[in-house]
Amino acid sequence: MKSTFLVVLELAFFLLPGRVLYAQKDSEDGGSHYSSDDCQVTPVIHVLQYPGCVPKPIPSFACIGRCASYIQVSGSKIWQMERSCMCCQESGEREASVSLFCPKAKNGEKKFRKVSTKAPLECMCRPCTGIEDANVIPQELTSFADEGTLTGYFQKSHYKSIE
């Protein structure tokens, strides 16, 4: 059971104007802990598909994690609410070209089709905005290391500046 002082202190913390970076949560054992941003590049398997070609799973990366978001009463206008919505997003890209086998290719057409794909280079918490749907969808998490298997597929592309 929380003391009245702690409840008042927590309430005052959330009503202060400005950005809340950490939110306190009660754990099952009765203690408290603070959650913070946890957004990182994570190895995944992407399945590349093209009509008439055999889908091909490849090792790739995705931005996975959580970022601090909140809504609170405005410090200057108590009848208004302040919102901060942060999302785990890419801050740079990797590019790769992969060949897909296309057994249904017509005579004169190539049996292999080169498909380009992208993956995040780095991830960070940024304001949530609409992001274009990617052509590839993470299918499952993998245990690939950052070196070795994955580095053969991807090369550094360009860096997107967020300002």
Swiss-Prot record:
PROSITE patterns: CTCK_2 (PS01225). Gene3D superfamilies: Cystine-knot cytokines (2.10.90.10). Final heterodimeric neurohormone released at the end of the molting cycle, involved in the sclerotization (tanning) of the insect cuticle, melanization and wing spreading. The bursicon gene is encoded by two loci: burs124 on chromosome arm 2L contains exons 1, 2 and 4, and burs3 on arm 2R contains exon 3. Exon 3 is trans-spliced into position in the mature transcript. This unusual gene arrangement has existed for at least the 150 million years (MY) of mosquito evolution since the split of the culicid and anophelid family lineages, but is younger than the 250 MY split of the dipteran suborders Nematocera and Brachycera (containing the Culicidea and Drosophilidae, respectively). One of its GO terms (cellular component) is extracellular space. The gene is burs124. Heterodimer of burs and pburs. Keywords: Disulfide bond, Hormone, Secreted, Signal. This is Bursicon. Disulfide bonds join C39-C88, C53-C102, C63-C123, C67-C125, C85-C128. It is found in: Secreted. Residues 1-23 form the signal peptide. Residues 39-129 form the CTCK domain. The keyword DNA-binding does not apply. GO terms for molecular function: hormone activity; receptor ligand activity.
